[in-house]
Swiss-Prot record:
Residue span of motif Nuclear localization signal: 14-18
Domain PARP alpha-helical: 181-299
Protein family according to the UniProt entry: Belongs to the ARTD/PARP family.
Subunit structure: Interacts with PARP1; leading to activate PARP1 in absence of DNA. Interacts with PRKDC. Interacts with XRCC5/Ku80; the interaction is dependent on nucleic acids. Interacts with XRCC6/Ku70; the interaction is dependent on nucleic acids. Interacts with EZH2, HDAC1, HDAC2, SUZ12, YY1, LRIG3 and LIG4.
Domain PARP catalytic: 313-533
UniProt EC number: 2.4.2.-
GO molecular function, one term: NAD+-protein-lysine ADP-ribosyltransferase activity
Organism: Mus musculus (Mouse)
Protein name: Protein mono-ADP-ribosyltransferase PARP3
Keyword set includes Glycosyltransferase: yes
PROSITE patterns cross-referenced by the UniProt entry: PARP_ALPHA_HD, PARP_CATALYTIC, WGR
Residues bearing PTM ADP-ribosyl aspartic acid: D138
Length: 533
């Protein structure tokens, strides 16, 4: 084997230490976090399909607003019902709209001159559809063959302020505020625009058959997503331990589609009746939770702008919300060239991704957490592909243990030494006539490797005495061409050669190697790549 060539690269770790390295399964820990989250503040809007929605004098009375949903796979039901009590001066209206999920549906407007009469009409309709009292909605209990209350949240007022801030000068009463010029370079400005794009989030939801009309961005609450996790947990338990007297998978699937509305058009909603379908819905909810996280970041209140003369540019504000330093690399730097070679040599041989930009990543607190493994050797720079909709969440929260209960190598964080393997997990967005995607390169402290050549989805940790699990593939980048980058004083192997056959693993069930760690702290994100596919 040729000696490894070294290139020295130094990065600064964060000075804030994050305590603890115990990792939990992401699915259950995410569900618990959502359940424990405080209720979101609601800003209630008039239903956009209501003819009064463009009348600024019409508003929803107090919190008399509800979105109901009902899915029954056996009867091919997948329907919604919206009720709002509207007011304008001394006039009151009870607005009802209903239909199949994904369609505008039918509507009805009742007029009242007495508020109490309007309230009675609202409460009566709520009772008819749910068999729950409006006054007891905080203790809502879903009833058979009735609608379920869906918790949604109006678009935050602060978001409107952010949009308005796009203009060079903003006046708020007698106080004049000026938006500062953006401090980010053009490539990073475009990155921040993309990973916080509402249109991108909506497209990601549409690809998952989620009803973006029922759950437009900014409206889905943490508590509602948590109910989706609970419904999937019930489905998983029913698959593992079927009983004759329990709910059927079809009934439990209907419960899931009721709390997380899906748009299937006029087609019958498909039952969640296999581990593969269940896993797809788990992954979907994790993406949904990450979308909610990105939206929560943007909706978080900043300083009161009316008290200052200058406000940050919206892109600077979003960048600061990530709590992550992104440094754009010049294409002439040694790091960039090494990454470019790594991509070209291990990318798809028919259509290799086109590298556009590379950012050095320094997540707040991650350097200190990674330091816990400073004595663990055998470090490699490895690929991780992802959905563009979760890039902001990853930059904020890092890579987390994914619930691969049906995964080939168990519950861990998956990496690859060949770009073409990880690129298969990249979901892109359309931007400027191109399909734009993002990939991460992480420094992974592998330590002592345990090799496998057949699937083992039961793995939750390496065997005793080992630090990682490698599903050895039939090919691997030519180790004779590996180089080393020095990152924070540690040598990190970076493949530079094309994939070659591995005679020792020619019978492996894995065509390409997969690298698994089971502690989130064993990885540090080092680079973010923008690619065109």
């Amino acid at each position: 084997m040729a000696p490894k060539r070294k290139a020295s690269v130094q990065t600064e770790g964060s000075k804030k230490r994050r305590q603890g390295t115990e990792e939990e399964d992401s699915f259950r820990s995410t569900a618990e976090a959502l359940r424990a989250a405080p209720a979101d503040n609601r800003v209630i809007r008039v239903d956009p399909s209501c003819p009064f929605s463009r009348n600024p004098g019409i508003q929803v009375h107090e919190d008399y607003d509800c979105t109901l949903n009902q899915t029954n796979i056996g009867n091919n039901n997948n329907k919604f019902y919206i009720i709002q009590l509207l007011e304008e001066g001394s006039r009151f209206f009870c607005w009802n709209r209903w239909g199949r999920v994904g369609e505008v549906g039918q509507s009805k407007m009742n007029h009242f001159t007495c508020l109490e009469d309007a309230k009675k009409d609202f409460k009566k309709k709520f009772w008819e559809k749910t068999k729950n009292k409006w006054e007891e909605r905080d203790r809502f209990v879903a009833q058979p063959n009735k609608y379920t209350l869906i918790e949604v949240q109006g678009e935050a007022e602060s978001q409107e302020a952010v949009v308005k801030a796009l203009s060079p000068q903003v006046y708020s009463g007698p106080v004049r505020t000026v938006v500062k010029p953006c401090s980010l370079d053009p490539a990073t400005q475009n990155l921040i625009t993309n990973i916080f794009s509402k249109e991108m989030f909506k497209n990601a939801m549409t690809l998952m058959n989620l009803d973006v009309k029922k759950m437009p961005l900014g409206k889905l609450t943490k508590q509602q997503i948590a109910r989706g996790f609970e419904a999937l947990e019930a489905l998983e338990e029913a698959m593992k331990n079927p009983t004759g007297d329990g709910q059927s998978l079809e009934e439990l699937s209907s419960c899931f589609y009721t709390v997380i509305p899906h748009n299937f058009g006029r087609s019958r909603p498909p039952p969640i009746n296999s581990p593969d379908v269940l896993q797809a819905k788990k992954d979907m909810l994790l993406v949904l939770a990450d979308i909610e996280l990105a939206q929560t970041l943007q909706a978080a209140p900043g300083e009161e702008e009316e008290k200052v003369e200058e406000v940050p540019h919206p892109l600077d504000r979003d960048y600061q919300l990530l709590r992550c330093q992104l440094q754009l690399l010049d294409s002439g730097e040694s790091e960039y060239k090494a990454i470019q070679t790594y991509l070209k040599q291990t990318g798809n041989s028919y259509r290799c991704p086109d590298l556009r930009h590379v950012w050095k990543v320094n997540r707040e607190g991650e350097g200190d957490r990674f330091q816990a493994h400073s004595k663990l050797g055998n470090r490699r720079l490895l690929w991780h592909g992802t959905n563009v909709a979760v890039v902001a969440a990853i930059l904020t929260s890092g890579l987390r243990i994914m619930p691969h209960s049906g995964g080939r190598v168990g519950k861990g964080i998956y990496f690859a030494s060949e770009n073409s393997k990880s690129a298969g997990y990249v979901t892109t967005m359309h931007c400027g006539g191109h399909q734009v995607g993002y990939m991460f390169l992480g420094e992974v402290a592998l330590g002592k490797e345990h090799h496998i050549t057949i699937d083992d989805p039961s793995l939750k940790s390496p065997p005793s005495g080992f630090d990682s699990v490698i599903a050895r593939g039939q090919t691997e980048p030519d180790p004779a061409q590996d180089i080393e980058l020095e990152l924070d004083g540690q040598p990190v192997v970076v493949p530079q050669g094309p994939p070659v056959q591995c005679p020792s693993f020619k019978s492996s069930s894995f065509s390409q190697s997969e690298y698994l760690i089971y502690k989130e702290s064993q990885c540090r994100l080092r680079y973010l790549l923008e690619i065109h596919l």
